[in-house]
Amino acid sequence: MHSVVPAAFADSRQVPAPQPPGTEMPRTAGRVLIVEDDASMRQAIERLLGAAGFEAGSYGSAEALLANGAAADARCIVSDLKLPAISGLEMLDEIRARGWQPPLILITAHDAPGLREEAVRHGVAALLAKPFRGSALLDAIASVTGRDRPGLPAG
């Protein structure tokens, strides 16, 4: 079986192929929300998180996430910086204004000068520049949630 993996994952071995029905790992590591307008990237992150034991919720825009209200009880959020209408940073401001406190991991292909400082001012918990390894994202999730890093199944 051959899988196409977005270029944002520098190591395609970190994105496992979907498992046959009935053989998935139990999702016990918590709910992680993904906000990414690039469908292939969003699906790759969702597969990675699922294989690591997370329940992943996916959204193609900040507006979709905010309308859903799912951020209120998420373990953390992984969001692209550049989204169609509301940026990842603006979304985080709105999440905080609503009193929700999940940590946000910001991913971006535009790691411009001053971005890290701006991200810190907005309360971003971690920033990953694309392309990144799947293991780097799992490490960031473990770091911002204060939990041990879940592993990927052998194979």
Predicted segments with their positions:
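Active-site residues of response regulator receiver
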Residues: 80, 108
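Alpha4 helix (beta4-alpha4-beta5 surface) of REC/receiver domains from two-component response regulators
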Residues: 90, 111-126
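C-terminal output helix
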Residues: 114, 132-141
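Conserved acidic carboxylate
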Residues: 36
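Charged docking surfaces used in two-component/phosphorelay signaling
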Residues: 43-47, 51
